[in-house]
């Protein structure tokens, strides 16, 4: 998204030329904007809220209250998938399983752990692996992991590819679980993964996003 926005600005705003660089994601982007390392960056609003308030993973860093939001791009949604043969249906079924939660300090990890928080799932009772969205989905397909998460616009590429080769199950949430997540972070909204987003997904699945 950042590269696309930069290209639009460069092509359409007189006197503006943007240079882009890669990063590890929302957490780094918030810090880099705050310190002046970069002028503008893309970050999910849940991470921005934590950065501004000095909460969550920013508790040890402190408030980055010089951050300002200038616009929104698209809705990012938490999407967790497993193989249909696993018999797993809900995110809370992952207790004690092997799960890809996204890269370390990523928006995917942040959102996945937010979901797990109200379910009693953490690294003490479940194997949580920091893998990219594509690698996580591939590991599910290869039988190495039981489930993988992504926090991005739908459909998520790695999960889409998995659904093209394997029968998958999109992991659902209960309304009570959704309510717990929303109560813990004002940036989140309730949404759904509509039926048909992935091959073989016959029903809407409850989730949250930003």
What is each model feature region?
Residues 12, 62-64:
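Short, solvent-exposed loop/beta-turn-alpha elements that line the ligand-binding surface or hinge
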Residues 63, 70-77, 163-164, 174:
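Short Pro/Gly-enriched coil loops immediately N-terminal to beta-strands
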Residues 19-20, 39-43, 69, 79-81, ...:
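Structural recognition of the beta-strand scaffold that forms the well-ordered cores
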Residues 72, 91-93, 206-210:
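Short, flexible turn/loop "capping" segments at secondary-structure junctions
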Residues 1-20, 76-142:
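Bilobed "Venus flytrap"/periplasmic-binding protein-like clamshell domains
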Residues 34-36, 76, 95, 210:
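Residue-level preference for short coil/turn positions at secondary-structure junctions
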Residues 3-7, 19-61, 80, 88, ...:
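Pocket-flanking alpha-helical
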Residues 45, 56-57, 122-210:
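Pocket-lining segment of extracytoplasmic ligand-binding domains
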């Amino acid at each position: 998204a950042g590269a696309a926005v930069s290209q639009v600005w460069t092509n359409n705003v007189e006197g503006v030329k943007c240079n882009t660089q890669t990063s590890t994601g929302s957490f780094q982007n918030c810090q880099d904007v705050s310190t002046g390392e970069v002028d503008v960056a893309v970050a999910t609003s849940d991470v921005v809220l934590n950065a501004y308030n000095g909460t969550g993973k920013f508790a040890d860093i402190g408030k980055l209250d010089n951050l300002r939001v200038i616009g929104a791009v698209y809705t990012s949604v938490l999407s967790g998938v497993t193989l249909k043969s696993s018999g797993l249906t809900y995110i809370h079924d992952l207790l004690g399983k092997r799960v890809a939660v996204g890269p370390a300090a990523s928006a995917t990890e942040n959102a996945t752990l937010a979901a797990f928080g109200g379910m009693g799932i953490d690294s003490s009772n479940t194997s949580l692996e920091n893998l990219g969205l594509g690698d996580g989905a591939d590991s599910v397909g290869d039988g190495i992991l039981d489930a993988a998460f992504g926090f991005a616009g739908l459909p998520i590429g790695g999960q889409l590819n998995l659904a093209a080769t394997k029968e998958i199950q999109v992991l659902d949430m209960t309304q009570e679980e959704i309510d717990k997540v929303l109560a813990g972070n004002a940036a989140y909204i309730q949404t759904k993964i509509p039926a048909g987003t992935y091959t073989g997904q016959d029903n809407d699945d409850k989730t949250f996003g930003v």
